[in-house]
C-alpha cells in the first residue's frame, strides 16, 4: 500500500456540552475505531494503534461498493449490535478479538458489523485533513454511498437533545465537533470533545473469586507511574455469558500465583485466588469516589492491551 497509516485525531473528555452554531453533535458509538485506506490498488484497515484489521473485517474491503474514489482514507467506528439492537462493545470484541483468521467466516455470520463513517482525510491523491470539518463532511456525503455495511454518522445541531436520547437508550455518549476544525493527525484538542453517559476504564485482572468452581468475580487494578498495581474494585456483573465465565475459569489456570499482586490490600479478600496480572478488561462504572473503589462496576469485554499501559490518571 502506498499510503502510510496514520494515528487518528482524538476528542478530549468533557463534562459539558458546548453551544453555538459552530458546533455539531454525533452519537459516540460503543465500537472500535477503524480507518480505511484505499490507494487505488488495495484496501487495508487499521485501528487507532496501527494494528491491521483488514482480514478481521472483510465486509468493509469492497471499496467500490460504496465509493468511486480513485484513492481515499476514511475514519469511523466498527460496531456490532446486541439482542436489543444497541451498539455493544462486548459484541464487537467478538470480532475484533479474533486471533485466528480461519475463524472469521464463522464469526462474521454470528456477529454482523456496520462501519459508521464520520470523516474523510484523503481523497484522489490529495490530503484534505486541513480542510474545515464542514467542508470534509460535504465531501464525505458526495463520495460515499451507504449500503448494508456502510453508514455515514448522522449530524445533530442540538447537543442537549441528542444527549437526552443517548441517556434514554443507554448509549455511550456524544461527540461534539467544531465545524471549522481541522483533522489533527496524531492530535487531540478541544475542537472535538466527548461527553459520556457513563464512565469506563480498561483495568488489569489481579485476582478472582469462585462459586461452585467457576469464577464469579474479578479483582481489578491499575498501575501507577512506578509500575505498582493498585486495587480499584471487584466486578462480577456485566455482559459475559456463563459460557465465557467457564472459558475464562479454564484459561486462568496457568496464571495462578500465591502472592498478592496489588500494593494495597483489597477489601473482602477471603478465598481470593491471585493471578499474574497480564489480562485486561473494559469495565463500566457509575462513579469512582476518591480513595474508594469503583461504584457499580460492570464487565463489558476482554481487551488485548499491555497491562502496564493501564494507568491511574493522576
Roles of regions detected by a PLM:
Residues 1-314:
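Catalytic cores of nucleic-acid ligases and guanylyltransferases
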Amino acid at each position: 500500500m502506498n499510503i502510510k497509516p496514520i494515528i487518528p485525531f482524538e476528542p478530549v473528555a468533557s463534562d459539558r456540552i458546548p453551544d453555538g452554531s459552530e458546533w455539531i453533535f454525533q452519537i459516540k458509538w460503543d465500537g472500535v475505531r477503524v480507518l480505511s485506506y484505499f490507494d487505488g490498488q488495495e484496501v487495508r484497515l487499521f485501528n487507532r494503534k496501527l494494528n491491521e484489521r483488514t482480514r478481521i473485517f472483510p465486509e468493509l474491503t469492497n471499496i467500490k461498493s460504496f465509493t468511486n474514489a480513485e484513492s481515499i482514507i476514511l475514519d469511523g467506528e466498527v460496531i456490532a449490535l446486541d439482542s436489543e439492537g444497541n451498539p455493544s462493545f462486548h459484541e464487537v470484541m467478538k470480532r475484533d478479538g479474533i486471533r485466528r483468521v480461519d475463524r472469521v467466516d464463522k464469526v462474521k455470520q454470528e456477529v454482523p458489523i456496520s462501519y459508521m463513517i464520520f470523516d474523510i482525510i484523503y481523497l484522489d491523491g490529495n490530503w484534505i485533513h486541513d480542510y474545515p470539518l464542514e467542508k470534509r463532511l460535504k465531501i464525505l456525503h458526495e463520495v460515499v454511498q451507504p449500503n448494508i455495511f456502510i453508514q455515514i454518522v448522522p449530524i445533530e445541531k442540538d447537543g442537549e437533545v441528542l444527549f437526552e436520547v443517548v441517556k434514554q437508550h443507554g448509549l455511550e455518549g456524544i461527540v461534539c465537533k467544531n465545524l471549522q476544525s481541522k483533522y489533527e493527525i496524531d492530535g487531540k484538542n478541544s475542537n472535538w470533545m466527548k461527553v459520556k453517559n457513563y464512565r469506563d476504564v480498561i483495568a488489569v485482572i489481579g485476582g478472582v473469586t469462585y462459586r461452585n468452581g467457576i469464577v464469579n468475580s474479578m479483582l481489578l487494578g491499575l498501575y501507577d507511574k512506578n509500575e505498582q498495581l493498585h486495587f480499584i474494585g471487584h466486578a462480577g456483573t456485566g455482559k459475559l455469558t456463563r459460557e465465557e465465565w467457564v472459558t475464562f475459569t479454564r484459561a486462568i489456570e496457568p496464571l495462578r500465583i500465591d502472592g498478592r499482586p496489588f500494593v494495597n490490600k483489597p477489601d473482602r479478600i477471603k478465598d481470593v485466588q491471585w493471578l499474574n496480572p497480564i489480562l485486561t478488561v473494559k469495565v463500566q462504572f457509575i462513579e469512582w469516589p476518591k480513595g474508594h473503589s469503583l461504584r457499580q462496576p460492570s464487565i463489558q469485554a476482554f481487551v488485548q492491551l499491555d497491562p502496564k499501559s493501564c494507568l491511574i490518571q493522576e
